[in-house]
């Protein structure tokens, strides 16, 4: 099989040396001899011997300034780097270890193993800058990926081999839902998972490491972290490093891969910081002028090829809950399914706090999910939309001013809202309640009966934070009602 991008042979690099002429934070200007200027994206090494700060920095060539000068971005703190320091051109881009042996370990954006220093140095390495698969090798998929979460499976079904995003502002549950998907899908998936921690909290990375060990799926997972305390160069490249590992499993091992990215907004934010440091003219809302290109270069590599797939789940922070912000808006164009987490739903105590009217999926179509699934989903959406339209009237005049038909619809909508909530495995340690999984067929049947009015006599409380019909029957009985 032909791989569409270069593999890195460490022994084949040609090294030339230059010297540092300017250091401004993470931006380092380096002068090379004439005729020996390194190519864009080449990795450079600068050795710092400054007492306790002895280390080797990795710089990436970002611009050619002319007169044998290159402008680079450091992927590590530049403390101790001074003018005149010797810099070596490795002759190749940043590369990361690939292969079956990366599973069960944590790496940084440079491919250094964090849990076992030195591990992986003798593995095959691939450049993180690779071309997407050729058009003729692509294989679009329409197979549904079952999660066991009612609100997702019914209203925004996920595509196996597709790109899925969880949108939301600060504190509405994006990371919890990503961890929930790891728990639900990785356990039952049987393939390989790769997790990219892009600019998020170190604590969350440690929590995930512990959770994966407890769930016994760490042995099938590779983790790559570039946390929020690291330089923007690292945060900008860590997603590419994780994706490169995932591509090896897809292209060389012929496996279906799950790729989790938390958070794709931090990738965009790091690109904006780098763009500013390089002196580029800012675009809309201060973002980099190359935003669409950078997002496209990442997203186009996340795709399905013949017989193999990368299924990507990406958390996307929405600044100030503004969906017109260029960062989330640019991401929308590349997605197969979107799950939007709403502060209004969160305030009602409904978890996961998914806004069913704002979320969408390209496979919610009778030709893919079936006529019954599509019909029930559309009826649920119709009822919830009508309830939303009536809320202003209810707030001003009260529910008693509605027609009998609308009163009945409002009561069903309130039950539907609560029935879309569900206990999650990732939150068990906080709630004390075990997570529940509901098969798609049972979800469709339950909501069909609910829309037809078969549960109108059951109290609203019975629908809150439960699983399927068995849970509903037990809770209804405890409240003095029967299904």
UniProtKB/Swiss-Prot annotation:
Keyword Nucleotide-binding belongs to the record: yes
A GO cellular component annotation in the UniProt record: proton-transporting ATP synthase complex
Pfam family, one: ATP-synt_VA_C
Domain of life, source organism: Bacteria
Gene Ontology MF terms: ATP binding; ATP hydrolysis activity; proton-transporting ATP synthase activity, rotational mechanism
Location of this chain's protein in the cell: Cell membrane
Keyword Cell membrane: yes
Chief localisation class: membrane
EC number: 7.1.2.2
Binding site for ATP: 168-175
Keywords: ATP synthesis, ATP-binding, Cell membrane, CF(1), Hydrogen ion transport, Ion transport, Membrane, Nucleotide-binding, Translocase, Transport
Membrane topology summary: Peripheral membrane protein
Subunit note: F-type ATPases have 2 components, CF(1) - the catalytic core - and CF(0) - the membrane proton channel. CF(1) has five subunits: alpha(3), beta(3), gamma(1), delta(1), epsilon(1). CF(0) has three main subunits: a(1), b(2) and c(9-12). The alpha and beta chains form an alternating ring which encloses part of the gamma chain. CF(1) is attached to CF(0) by a central stalk formed by the gamma and epsilon chains, while a peripheral stalk is formed by the delta and b chains.
Listed HAMAP family: ATP_synth_beta_bact
Family of the protein in this entry: Belongs to the ATPase alpha/beta chains family.
Protein name: ATP synthase subunit beta
Source organism per UniProt: Mycobacterium marinum (strain ATCC BAA-535 / M)
Lineage: Bacteria, Bacillati, Actinomycetota, Actinomycetes, Mycobacteriales
């Amino acid at each position: 099989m032909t791989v569409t991008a270069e593999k890195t042979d460490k022994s084949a690099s040609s090294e030339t040396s230059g010297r540092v002429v300017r250091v401004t934070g993470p931006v380092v200007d380096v002068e090379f001899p004439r005729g020996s200027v390194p190519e864009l994206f080449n990795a450079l090494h600068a050795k710092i011997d400054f007492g306790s700060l002895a280390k080797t920095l990795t710089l990436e060539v970002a611009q050619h300034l002319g007169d044998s000068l290159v402008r680079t971005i450091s992927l590590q703190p530049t403390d101790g780097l001074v003018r005149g320091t010797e810099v070596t051109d490795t002759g190749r881009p940043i590369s990361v270890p690939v292969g079956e042996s990366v599973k069960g370990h944590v790496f940084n954006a440079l491919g250094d193993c964090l849990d076992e220093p030195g591990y992986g140095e003798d593995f095959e390495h691939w450049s993180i800058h690779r071309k997407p698969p050729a058009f003729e090798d692509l294989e679009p998929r329409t197979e549904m990926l079952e999660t066991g979460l009612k609100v997702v499976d019914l209203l925004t079904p996920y595509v196996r081999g597709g790109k899925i995003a969880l949108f939301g502002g600060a504190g509405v549950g994006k990371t919890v839902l990503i961890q929930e998907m790891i728990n639900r899908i990785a356990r039952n998936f049987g393939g390989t998972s790769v997790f990219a921690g892009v600019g998020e909290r170190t604590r969350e990375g440690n929590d995930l490491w512990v959770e994966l060990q407890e769930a016994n799926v760490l042995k099938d997972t590779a983790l790559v972290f570039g946390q929020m305390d690291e330089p923007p160069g690292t945060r900008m490249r860590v997603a590419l490093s994780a994706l490169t590992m995932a591509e090896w499993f897809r292209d060389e091992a012929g496996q279906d891969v799950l790729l989790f990215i938390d958070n794709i907004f931090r990738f965009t934010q790091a690109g904006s910081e780098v763009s500013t440091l390089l002196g580029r003219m800012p675009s809309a809302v201060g973002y980099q002028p190359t935003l669409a290109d950078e997002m496209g270069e990442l997203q186009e590599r996340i795709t399905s090829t013949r017989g193999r797939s990368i299924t990507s789940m990406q958390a996307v922070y929405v600044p100030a809950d503004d969906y017109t912000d260029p960062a989330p808006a640019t991401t929308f164009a590349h997605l197969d399914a979107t799950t939007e987490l709403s502060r209004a739903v969160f305030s009602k105590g409904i978890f996961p706090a998914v806004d069913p009217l704002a979320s969408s999926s390209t496979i919610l179509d009778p030709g893919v999910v079936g006529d019954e699934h599509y019909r029930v989903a559309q009826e649920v959406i119709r009822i919830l939309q009508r309830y939303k339209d009536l809320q202003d009237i209810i707030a001003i005049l009260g529910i008693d001013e509605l027609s009998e038909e609308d009163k009945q619809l409002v009561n069903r909508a309130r039950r539907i809202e609560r029935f879309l909530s569900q206990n999650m495995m990732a939150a068990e340690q906080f709630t004390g309640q075990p997570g529940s999984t509901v098969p798609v067929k049972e979800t469709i049947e339950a909501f069909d009966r609910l829309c037809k009015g078969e549960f109108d006599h059951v109290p609203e409380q019975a629908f809150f934070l439960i699983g399927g019909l068995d849970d509903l029957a037990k809770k209804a009985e405890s409240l003095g009602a029967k299904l």
